[in-house]
Amino acid sequence: FQFKAFPSNSHILADVLAQHDINANDVDGVDLVRLFDTINSRIELLLDANHMLGHAYFMKVRNSQDIADVIAYKVVPLLEEYFFDDPQKIQLIFNSLNVNGELKENAVYYHEELSPDNLFSYTGEYDIEPVKHFFVNPNLTSESLVQIYQG
């Protein structure tokens, strides 16, 4: 028995896509290599290298909608498991917040704040704190994806 590690590798991803005549540095205007490497660098910084995304997640990508689907239906659920107690880190990974910590337009990972002031006319002696509800932008665009690796 032998264990051989296959770390994340954007070059393998680019080579596989090239076999299908897809330029991984320009998939409908999205630099998939840069996006992949940026997400993994942020995961490594916020968690560790053992939790980085594998290149296999993106090997079947043919257009920017495929990238958006991988992000929404594969990457986000994985990150929600990784950061179940701190979903704002997912916003950091996707560069969804501006320099003031406010949600960017076209962000990948949104949040809404549920405020007791908006939901109850009276709370009595209860001290109810606002709660943030996090979710994937239902209208991911190429611009949303580019925003991950560009400020």
Can you describe what each PLM-predicted range is?
Residues F1-G151:
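C-terminal regulatory/interaction module of P-loop NTP-utilizing enzymes
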